[in-house]
Design a protein with these regions (language model features):
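Transmembrane-helix signature of 12-pass secondary carriers
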Residues: 1-449
Length: 449
């Protein structure tokens, strides 16, 4: 790991080309708390639904609604907080949102009705939507260009770790009394509380400060944390057209569309199959649902780590397009083999391979959207992409059990294949390459379309 520049060395290194320091890693690790918590509460809900069904009197409608509740809250939180974070900054939202998350997580322990749990899941989603926006923006803006992909991918690994940890907690607590599901829900407060104190000392983004003409503050952050050898960022004045007006205007509408569509097409099959993996395995004829789920989650975590290792070795476009088309092919083969009566080992293996691939691709959800937009639109742009994806995910987790019950698992899986193909085609035609772009250049030069 590179250390900061010597105090005797004159400032000569561009902010975006600064060497990697402990400060950068600390910022990235601080950003992982919300992602771990998000992965956990989204991963645990399927297990909780199965365990609390009788106690809460869950109908198929309540099951679908609870599966989609957090995602729906994420939609609202991301789209509402994005413009706010672009106007007031990232630091304070980033510092305090995990405390609210911890309180809401603990309240889940005391729910008595499906409606109470639904309300808390929606509120948790709102907080996580805010955290998605500010975490991705803040970590991106603090990261040197050369290491940005890997630092942002730490957030993806944290998300996968939270998702897998949820499965482990569910496995350990299932069968330990009628209230075991309450502990499954409340335990998500622990990582949020751990990261809360760690975040309070994180400084504001120098890029955001410079963009808002607070140059002295930006220079002070750079000097204190990166040393005098790194030049503070400079930025043009704020555009007259900001927020959603600019995002859907001629300069950025293509990037806004690509950011939203790739995200939607990636997470719909990921969340639909992940949330109800046990039910999917049962419908495909696999009797060892717990073993299948364990393998699925192991490959989920491995995929996220492999994605981190690959993210700066493969162009963003190649990673995007390739994982969409390969994912569609894997899922098609899975359907055909399952229909042909393939053994459980083959079906589970294909499902695990799909989980591995999609989890590796999830790294792009953390790296790519923040790179598409300039600093004064970054949180809003990430908010639009996140909101669109969570709306699609909420719909898919609500509809998958309904479609599977009415038309069979093949119909649900074929729908996922179609969505993956659409995502691949959209990225093939319109996705720009961002891995070599400086964030300073993105601020200075509006893109076309």
């Amino acid at each position: 790991m590179t250390t900061p520049i010597s105090p005797t060395q004159p400032a000569s290194i561009a902010y975006d080309d600064a060497p990697l320091t402990r400060f950068h890693i600390r910022i990235a690790v601080a950003g992982t708390g919300g992602q771990f918590s998000d992965g956990f509460i989204l991963g645990i809900i399927g297990i909780v639904i199965a365990a609390a069904g009788d106690t809460l009197g869950l109908t198929p409608l309540w099951t679908g609604a609870l599966g989609a509740a957090t995602l729906t809250g994420l939609f609202a939180g991301a789209i509402a907080v994005g413009p706010v974070a672009d106007r007031i900054g990232r630091r304070w939202i980033f510092g305090w949102d995990m405390l609210f998350f911890a309180v809401l997580s603990l309240l889940q322990f005391f729910v008595q009705t499906p409606g109470q749990l639904l309300t808390l899941r929606l509120l948790l989603g709102l907080v996580l939507g805010a955290d998605y926006v500010v975490s991705k923006s803040l970590v991106t803006e603090h990261s040197p260009r050369k290491f940005r992909g890997r630092l942002m991918s730490l957030l993806a690994v944290a998300w996968a770790a939270g998702y897998v940890f949820a499965y482990l907690i569910g496995f350990l607590l299932t069968g330990h009394g009628d209230n075991a599901w309450r502990y499954m829900l409340a335990i998500s407060a622990l990582p949020a509380l751990l990261v809360f104190g760690f975040r309070l000392g994180v400084p504001e983004s120098p890029l955001w400060l410079a963009r808002h003409r607070r140059d002295a503050e930006a220079a002070d952050v750079v000097r204190r944390h990166l040393g005098p050898g790194v030049l503070p960022p400079t930025a043009p004045p704020l555009s007259q057209h900001r927020g959603f007006t600019a995002l859907f205007g001629p300069a950025y509408r293509r990037r806004t569309g690509v950011g939203a569509l790739f995200y939607v097409c990636q997470v719909i099959p990921f969340f639909a199959l992940g949330t109800f993996s046990s039910q999917v395995m049962e419908a495909l004829g696999v009797t060892s649902k717990m073993g299948a789920g364990a393998l699925y989650n192991v490959f989920l975590l491995i995929g996220a780590v492999v994605g981190l290792l690959l993210i700066d070795r493969i162009s963003r476009r190649r990673f995007l397009v390739g994982t969409f088309f390969i994912g569609a092919a894997l899922l098609t083969v899975l359907i055909l083999f399952a229909d042909a009566g393939a053994s459980a080992i083959v079906v589970i293996g294909l499902f695990a391979a799909f989980a591995f691939l999609m989890s590796a691709a999830v790294n792009l959800e953390f790296v790519y959207p923040p790179e598409l937009f300039p600093t004064d639109l970054r949180a809003s742009g990430v908010g639009i992409a996140t909101a669109a994806s969570r709306l699609g995910s909420a719909a898919s987790t609500f509809l998958l059990p309904v479609v599977e019950a009415g038309h069979g698992i093949d119909t649900a899986l074929v729908g996922c294949v179609v969505i993956l193909l659409v995502g691949g085609l959209v990225c093939w035609v319109w996705a720009p390459e961002t891995s070599t772009e400086s964030l300073l250049d993105t601020d200075l030069a509006p893109t076309s379309g």
